[in-house]
Amino acid sequence: MEVLMAERANLVFHNKVIDGTAIKRLISRLIDHFGMAYTSHILDQVKTLGFQQATATSISLGIDDLLTIPSKGWLVQDAEQQSLILEKHHHYGNVHAVEKLRQSIEIWYATSEYLRQEMNPNFRMTDPFNPVHMMSFSGARGNASQVHQLVGMRGLMSDPQGQMIDLPIQSNLREGLSLTEYIISCYGARKGVVDTAVRQSDAGYLTRRLVEVVQHIVVRRTDCGTIRGISVSPRNKSRMMSERIFIQTLIGRVLADDIYIGSRCVAFRNQDLGIGLVNRFITFGTQPISIRTPFTCRSTSWICRLCYGRSPTHGDLVELGEAVGIIAGQSIGEPGTQLTLRTFHTGGVFTGGTAEHVRAPYNGKIKFNEDLVHSTRTRHGHPAFLCYIDLSVIIESEDIIHSVTIPPKSFLLVQNDQYVESEQVIAEIREGTYTFQFKERVRKYIYSDSEGGMHWSTDVSHAPEFTYSNVHLLPKTSHLWILSGGSCGSSLILFSIHKDQDQMNIPFLSVERKSISSLSVNNDQVSQKFFSSDFSDKKILIPNYSELNGIVGTSHYNFIYSAIFHENSDLLAKRRRNRFLIPFQSIQEQEQEKEFIPHSGISVEIPINGIFRRNSIFAFFDDPRYRRKSSGILKYGTLKADSIIQKEDMIEYRGVQKFKTKYEMKVDRFFFIPEEVHILPESSAIMVENYSIIGVDTRITLNIRSQVGGLIRVERKKKRIELKIFSGDIHFPDKTDKISRHSGILIPPGRGKTNSKESKIVKNWIYVQRITPTKKKFFVLVRPVATYEIADSINLATLFPKDLFREKDNIQLRVFNYILYGNGKPTRGISDTSIQLVRTCLVLNWDQDNKNSSLEEVRAFFVEVNTKGLIRDFIRIGLVKSHISYIRKRNNPSSEKKEGSDHSMNPFYSISPKAGILHQSLRQNHGTIRMFLNRNRNPILLILSSSNCFRIGPFNHVKYHNVINQSIKKKTSNYIKNCRAPYGTAIQILIFIHFAFTKLINQISCIKYLHLQTSNVFFPVIHSYLIDENGRIFNLDPYSNLVLNPFKLNWYFLHQNYNNNYCEETSTIISLGQFFCENVCIAKKEPYLKSGQVLIVQRDSVVIRSAKPYLATPGAKVHGHYREILYEGDTLVTFIYEKSRSGDITQGLPKVEQVLEVRSIDSISLNLEKRIKGWNRCITRILGIPWGFLIGAELTIVQSRISLVNKIKQVYRSQGVQIHNRHIEIIVRQITSKVLVSEEGMSNVFLPGELIGLLRAERTGRALEEAICYRAVLLGITRASLNTQSFISEASFQETARVLAKAALRGRIDWLKGLKENVVLGGVIPPGPGSQRIGALSTATYQHSFGKNKNYLIRGRYERYFILPQGILCLFYQIQNLPFLELH
């Protein structure tokens, strides 16, 4: 007693608050000093003391104890300011939606995390005995995240799917939530309840499927006799395995081979491993250890004790009769059921990670090697440099040189030689991938905010990603523009009298889009009432047609109306790239005479925009007489055939898939040499030899038979095999035969063909072809020829009514015959389609009016006229002049020479040259029609009115760039016409007039590197210009004859600085068609521009059409075509970016399900099915078909098994759940144990496409001494459950009727080896006592057919021996060098 009192006197009394870490240290010291038993007694006393003090203190939580952090106000205000700046940058087009989303998340996440970190220091300083602080800080009740929501801010919330809601909740629960914040909070607040209900059912269903697939796996034998093994090594070069994982992998396993340290054997084969033996392996660093796993067991429907290993319950080898399959299924499924509750009651608050910043320690200049970095764009849209290796950055100040090493894949946010201040961020280091175990590729769709036409720069790839789609890929960062305009959503407007560039009152077509019927190109009937208007105050006129089939023409419109379509004929339109294809459906009965060609074969081809070019095809007819069903070669009788594309006065024909050259017929006959052609894949098994002779209906491949007999020619090309069959006679000529020396020649009838034995008079045309199998051996093949005679020119009346060819406005329609294939070109038919050799085309042409410099174009429109109850369809064709003066003439011809009578023609302004003032600025009730196509490729009108444009100016101190003034007087009597040309074209100056001219001193460099030498050319000072979507630039002063200087009208703005007495010249240049982003100042003391395109440039002001920019980065997909009309809400761009998944099991559990069902998890992770196909293909190509299939399937299955095990382990390990590998291996073994019988190689046992077990296929092949070709497949747990040996088990799982019906038809036998089928039928179940009876029914112990010293299938490093009847073929595979063969 005295000794204890003396020891107590020497003890030091500590009176301070301790935390959890200090308590752990105290307990550790107590155990070392007093032992385990006495320490537990001391801790019981501490626990009792704690409860007593807590009861006496009665700590409770009141609302007054929730104290808001004082720094929250300015932190939230700073975050709001950053978000506002970010929103402006997004509106200006500097960052796109994904970059804005990322930066917004990190701004608010950083703010929330800073508030959480300030929480405890604030309580410690202001109120250390606050109940909230004591509870959360000690961990007795609640945690930091929950208290943070009470006194800090709730922050960003997650929805039930784990996606982040980008609107943060700035309030905390103490302050109260607004209505909007409460609604957003409800998404996350119920997250735990939703997970408990919904995910619980998902986890339960997963457990049921897992048990279903392995319910028949029972331990039935002690040793299966296998010598296969999986190599496990902690010192793998590709990936170092941690010691903890290495121990967990080995404990409880059984060795597949002896283990040596030097020459001493330390462990024997079939010895189970304990912790002591594993520690010796780690200490001595032995070679890689080969262990037995469920993967290596040779059984098909059971497992042996040694391959399973120790039982986790008692630590010894598993007992016979134990249902290890059901245990494995529950071991994997049950943790998922429990882990749905692991939400920690945080209310769905989003948790993520931010980047680590490197800051400058003091002021100085940055120095680094520019060769080691390259410019890039950060994930927030900021310019930066990316380094791939360690980069040394030096900061030089006046007296200190500091060096900072930037790790690889980091962003450098400063430039070389840049001066930085102290604490300035100079680099951004992204956190490693270990922070977020799961990443997914997410698609974010950007929708149009306004209505208008889509324009893009040349950076957008105009070629669609897929054929006939409207998706375009973006190769680099650029802007997409939506030019504003109010659309009149009717596809029928194209067929009315309104033309492009017409001036009109806006209320005239201000019709709701839904109330106007639309034209569908998918075989819908076209219906439209034809009307006209003169754009004046007159009423709308409806013409009255007296003759149904006559030509209707007026002096006002100058159009041809031809009754091409007959009574009750339906107009069916078919999309064909950028044109309509309209086949004729019916004709009048009285016209169906013999000499008439059926109209069903005639197709009218009209561009979607309705505009024809000169010498373009209007219609075509395919004569069935020139149609073949077989492939062959075309030969001309003469060589007088011209390529149409090469001749200027001929036709350029645009085909469906590609440009196809046509050849004008100048011969009276041509020849067709038939041949049978088969295009086969590279891996096809051909059953005939090259240069062999076969008969009709001979098997060429497994599924293809020949249609004709003849000579076989096999040509192996890139990734395909071309097999040809030449029919005809074979001759062996003498050396004196001159004809046989030619490689291919046509011989007319009547000419003798002589060989060494006989002579023969040829009655028909033949084709002689020299065949040379070898250098010294040749023969001649005489092939039959089909001769086609060209008949007389087809009568036009047999194709179209005579009224169509009445010429008006110089429009001419002519018929031409064209051969679709060149001389000697092969013709190939696809599937059962026929091949058209000759096409009859109707060509549209007209004479260009040289007196008028305006462009003329032919437009075609569809109209439907209802006269006396009869509905007639018409095609209207006519010449149209496409400039403004023509429109004014068409509107009111009598007011052509009156001044001021047409001021309302321009929607933007009207200028009087005499007064020189702006009469009318941006009229609200007028608009200009633009013709476009909407998303459905239907024609539509876009009305550009003053509400879509804004005017800036007038500008002061404007001077022209590189010009001097000079006055020239010259009379003219003609109006200067408007010109149309692509961007960058130098326009020829036609007329000079009396005006103030400017002489250009230097040459102007036009776009596309075209230079215009203008040293002696005079241009006027233009008042204004207008550019439209078609690239035409107009001078909008209708009463002045001004020569326009297109495509390079630039302005420089000079501003006087009165303080310094000098002129400062800015570098801003304004050009027609130029795009401006918002908030770009073109000149000092001038208003900031809104985003848009320069539409009109005046002397002292510009008119800009409003436009919204959308920034897009490489890899984005643009939906829609150039100049396509988009409505508000239409999909514009799709961004694809990587996103970190939430770390809870609610996202991990579906991932486990996706892995077990063998579905593609995401586009970032490797797709196992693609890897399997790649392995099968590579191994087969290297080793040949028989051995390639066997070895390829075996190695592919091993690879996929270990990859699946690692993926499932990774999901559960991230949640802190440890599942032994053997449970996962039993499940994976079942979904990877099937192979698919392939078609290559004949088999008398299994059918092609049949699913069989891998071991069964190997044993059957050895028993029959016949190679069975198969390839590995991955089955999900659902498919594996429906492909078992028991149809009773399958029927009790899913699709009961289908399974039982198929089993009855096939006569399947169920041997009742599994647990489930015996439960269903009330028999003795296999596990436990029933295992002995089931084992007796099975075959006796399998005796291997080879000796133990020779029968190694896989030994040590997975070495595989294959034994053939003819001999032994040894193929060694050193699997330990492959990084994927590794168990974690």
Curated annotation (Swiss-Prot):
What subcellular locations does the record give? Plastid, Chloroplast
Q: Recorded E.C. number(s)?
A: 2.7.7.6
Q: Which domain of life is it from?
A: Eukaryota
Catalysed reaction, written as an equation:
RNA(n) + a ribonucleoside 5'-triphosphate = RNA(n+1) + diphosphate
Cofactor binding, per record: Binds 1 Zn(2+) ion per subunit.
- For whether the record's keyword set contains Transferase, the answer is yes
Q: Which UniProt keywords apply?
A: Chloroplast, DNA-directed RNA polymerase, Metal-binding, Nucleotidyltransferase, Plastid, Transcription, Transferase, Zinc
Tell me the InterPro entries matching this sequence.
DNA-dir_RpoC2_beta_pp, RNA_pol_beta''_euk, RNA_pol_Rpb1_3_sf, RNA_pol_Rpb1_4, RNA_pol_Rpb1_5, Rpb1_funnel_sf
Q: What NCBIfam families does the entry give?
A: rpoC2_cyan
Family statement drawn from the similarity comment of this UniProt entry: Belongs to the RNA polymerase beta' chain family. RpoC2 subfamily.
Q: What name is this protein filed under?
A: DNA-directed RNA polymerase subunit beta''
Q: What is the lineage of its organism?
A: Eukaryota, Viridiplantae, Streptophyta, Embryophyta, Tracheophyta
